[in-house]
Amino acid sequence: MIVSDTGPIVVFARIGRLSLLREVTGALLIPDAVHTEIFAKKGAMPGASEVAQATWIQRVSVVDRSIVDRMPKVLHGGEREAIALAKERGAQLLVDEIRARRAASDQGIEVIGTLRVLDEAKRLGHIGLARPIIAHMQSQGYRFERTLILSFLEIVGEG
């Protein structure tokens, strides 16, 4: 089971590859705050219509709000709720933002990111190359550290 933050879902939707996320994860849980960030924040985010049609993405409420309240305030509401939901469900967390990754790891949650999804997609034969997908994500404003990309591409044989 995987809980997702907003960023990875939206970037896969923006580049028209939301189905790739499904092929790798099977299904995703999102907390209420992530749903709100995607659909209600000053109008829907780009890619929201694709997400709305994705029946494999399930909205779930966090039960123990005290977990959310104890999260660092530098994290966005979606990140805090995603961490709390992953903790409640004993699930992996799909998130790319470094502060959220650290906070989740501090809670004992296994963290995966967009690049891990691409690695798995390549390993399973769903994509041939990760590099053009990463470039497309970057062209849509999604940021990865340059050294992280170079290291990742080396690991997946595209360096």
Feature-to-residue mapping (PLM):
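Mid-chain, well-packed structural core segment of small domains
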Residues: V95-L115, R123
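Active-site-proximal, substrate-binding regions of enzyme catalytic domains
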Residues: M1-A91, I98, D106-I109, P132, ...
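Hydrophobic alpha-helical interaction segments
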Residues: G113-V156
